[in-house]
Design a protein with these regions (language model features):
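Soluble catalytic domains of membrane acyltransferases
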Residues: 4-136
Length: 136
């Protein structure tokens, strides 16, 4: 699925690929702090995102808990507590959103980390790849 922002207009391509029910892992490229609302708009279901623990306390994230859930994670390693919370969310039927590049505010696509694939396999859930263009 692709999400394209053309000014204020949002175009979603491939929405038919979004699973109709059940849990899954949404794997998204990450260019901006405003990526999560675009993904929620495209998927049209609540999503809990993995968020870097050092970013959760910044003013840019103060609005996040009101719009969607998040599970904090360490940028450098996938901690056991993050794994447990993420798998619990998937087993409870939630959708888990992961930005596998591990950071935002980049103008180029960065190499992905393997946590999304690990959590998808551990939770026995499908992955939905999502590409965002137009925000870089």
């Amino acid at each position: 699925m692709f999400i394209c922002s053309l000014g204020a207009k949002i175009k979603v391509c491939g929405r038919h690929n979004v699973p109709k029910g059940g849990p899954f892992v949404v794997v998204i490229n990450h260019f901006s702090y405003i990526d999560p609302p675009f993904v929620i708009h495209a998927v049209q279901r609540p999503i809990s995102f993995l968020a870097a623990s050092d970013q959760v306390i910044t003013p840019l994230y103060l609005w996040a808990p009101f719009l969607y859930g998040f599970i904090t994670t360490d940028r450098t390693r996938l901690a056991p507590s993050t794994i447990k919370k993420s798998i619990h969310a998937l087993k409870s039927g939630d959708i888990l959103g992961i930005f596998p590049e591990g950071t935002s505010l980049s103008r180029v696509l960065r190499p992905a980390k393997n946590g999304a694939a690990f959590l998808s396999a551990a939770g026995n859930t499908p992955m939905l790849p999502v590409g965002i263009v137009g925000l870089e």
